[in-house]
Amino acid sequence: GLIVLGLVAAAFWGGASLDGVRPSLEIIAPAVDLSPPGAPLMLPFLFITIACGAISGFHCLVASGTTSKQVRNETDALPIGYGAMVTEGFLAVLVIFACVAGLGLGVTDASGEELTGVAAWSDRYASWGTAGGLGSKVAAFVDGASNLLAAMAIPPSVAIALMGVLVASFAGTTLD
């Protein structure tokens, strides 16, 4: 919970380093790219994306054996499912922000060169092929979110470790 609050603070205030110099935090992703090379059609994925929050809220309610045992009656399930859905949507917005603004603060490419701004975005998302695969998606989130935490004077190695633990925790709770 504290890590998520830190990401929210970094998103709204842009972080503040110990030396008083604030990093330039800007969204470097293009607003619209209607035809990325090699991308599948958007139509079926759009409905899956929109339904994901509602499904996750319902899944949070019924998939955990503890939640169903804690509600007094069926009407208590409505605010729990809705709250889980809203929380899931908020988390999705934080992840998007970390991947589009956090990457711009700097990433290291395969050759070891430090990239910032649009060059960092292009390194990760230049084509559908470079953005594909679970490893590149997790790396984009970990790098972007750790950059946001590093902007708040948290050492980069600690920020990367925290984000790695966060990703592992999400994976672990998903398997439950």
Q: Where are these predicted regions, by residue range?
A:
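Transmembrane helix-bundle signature of multi-pass membrane transporters/permeases
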Residues: 50-53, 81-88, 169
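Helix-loop-helix junctions that connect adjacent transmembrane segments
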Residues: 1-56
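Extracellular/periplasmic helix-exit of transmembrane alpha-helices
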Residues: 11-32, 86-143
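Hydrophobic, small-residue-rich membrane helices and short re-entrant helix-turn-helix hairpins
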Residues: 1, 58-92
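Alpha-helical transmembrane segments of multipass membrane proteins
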Residues: 4-7, 56, 87-95, 175
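A glycine-rich phosphate-binding loop feature that marks nucleotide/adenosyl-phosphate handling sites
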Residues: 84-85, 99-103, 162-169
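Membrane-helix boundary/coupling elements in multi-pass transport proteins
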Residues: 52-71, 130-133, 137, 141, ...
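Transmembrane-helix boundary/entry motifs in multi-pass membrane transporters
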Residues: 83, 148-158
